[in-house]
């Protein structure tokens, strides 16, 4: 055997030469040898490396070795060579016993003492290191033997047990069920049971026919054990076990309930055909009834079963509704803090929230407030489910009060780095601020405008975020006490350049449509007029108007020639007539500022305004066209340009319009155009006006001199309103008739991707025409109508003629309200009327809540 110097024992610092040291005596060498590990370890046991001791005694390592300089500390006496030999002999003789003690301790006789070879408690011996894998090997062999024994035993016992389970004596059946339950706890016998269809059928039969508690517990416990294996699930399903298990959901015994619901849960998760079988057996009703229990882990399993059954199945959703499921689910969200239960319950609510029947039930049960309680939960999956559900519900909750906590929480989560969280929060805020002044004020007071501006700035080109955020801002910047403040906040928060930039490509038409409405509202603030112009808003609006007008003219030419509607009539679900109306309406507000009028005039857009007066089938376009001409005609040169474009004839015809707004604007423009005419012409013109149905009161004319009246676009009637609710769902139809109609959305929404989620779409059709993707809730006919399925991105209320028929081919027209002729004056054109106080009154689609 050779010895090697350990690598960490260096002699480089030894000041003495070993050749100068005297040779120690044999006794001294023996004593120094005793200090090595051979004294306590043969080397075979520990595997320690032997080494030559230092003869100089000057090793640095030895200076710290207490055994080198304090012999009494390690040993109480010196050992002679004979004693060392005796110890080595004893260790050799007991080597086999040490190995046996480590590997087969059960074979040793009691009372035998085996000398230990472990010198250092921190260093296990070689035998000790081998002991653990040896024990594992031994147990594996034993288990293999026992497994085979269990399998053989079960195989031999199964035929007899089947007979006993079918016995008429219930005591015998009970004993047999308990025996089978015990066998099913072992893997080998469990496989033997599930491989026997006769045994599983006997268990199901015993479960169905017996009223004995022990029999029931044994049989259902066995089925529960089998349900952890796919083969067992198939055997239970084929044996008709699901109806028997559903029946047990009425059991008052906790253990039976646990076995039954967990077995059904496993079947629903992994066995094809189980969902239908559970529905047919009445499982939904029984599961909803179980929601009244208070064991959180049990409830988590029940709610997960409900989610599996309701997902993608409208009938199941209606059964849950009929069983008062929504109120129980909301109660759970309000009462517990167990994360898994809250998560599974929120998943059920998310599935139900796209059902038009369940949606109002959840809202009425306080679902919005209950879900809002968990927006600050550290569980991200719970927060996301709550947000998806809230967004699905939000179009049905536009009239719900007491949402201050929710609105504040939504503003907070707008700062999240998760794109899905921000998208949902913005969409919910958009819907909840639609036609609800209280919610608008609340959002403004908690910093919602600043948060939404920041969200738009940070979103970049993510339209799934920018579109709902722009819609929410559009609602917050008009028709409530804090609207003027909101308009200023957008400017002070550096939002104007970002918002105007969204009018450029690659923005899609639904987003552009929403931005146009927001710019119109922002222009209501005089301080925003110049910044909007400086950021290029007028130029971009005119460019969009040209594009939309060309497409509209092309469509009308095609319809006139062959009666067909070309594919290009819609772009991303948005009709170009909507863009025409929106851009002209925004230019109308911007034209109130003198320099803006000059810029608009220079864009060579007046001919288009005049041509729009001929859109007899779309009153709202006629109204905004007459409105912008009314503003531009303040300048005499522009009035002459308008007359030169041939506007006199269509304006004169519009004086007979049943829409007071159209008629009044037309009269105002004609009066401006007649300012340089003779006094006789003016008097004759005034006289003709008083003969029209809309202008019958002579007292309003102030001796034949026409002033300029208020902006009639905000004088509105409480007729059907188009609510631009932001939601998700397939393409929908905006109908001007009918009661509550909520959009049918998707059962669930992708968490990892927003692809395929059409957020926003085109305008609706008052004639029942298809809209673009992205259903939103909208208010139905008359003030009592509920939110319906309309499209997002803004649109107008459906204008109705005096005969009650729609006057617009798309859902964006709006008539002005009935007025006495004496109320019509033309004083103070620059004075804007107060916002309507009735939430059911809305302006054209580009106004706040459309």
Curated annotation (Swiss-Prot):
Name recorded for this polypeptide: Armadillo segment polarity protein
Record keywords: Cell adhesion, Cell junction, Cell membrane, Cytoplasm, Developmental protein, Membrane, Repeat, Segmentation polarity protein, Wnt signaling pathway
GO MF, one example: cadherin binding
The gene coding this protein: arm
Extent of the ARM repeats: 146-185, 188-228, 230-269, 272-311, 356-395, 397-434, 483-524, 594-634, 636-675
Coiled coil regions, renumbered to chain: none
UniProt family annotation: Belongs to the beta-catenin family.
Subcellular localization, as worded in the UniProt entry: Cytoplasm; Cell membrane; Cell junction, Adherens junction
Extent of Polar residues compositional bias: 1-20
Membrane topology field: Peripheral membrane protein
Gene Ontology biological-process annotations: canonical Wnt signaling pathway; cell-cell adhesion; positive regulation of transcription by RNA polymerase II; segment polarity determination
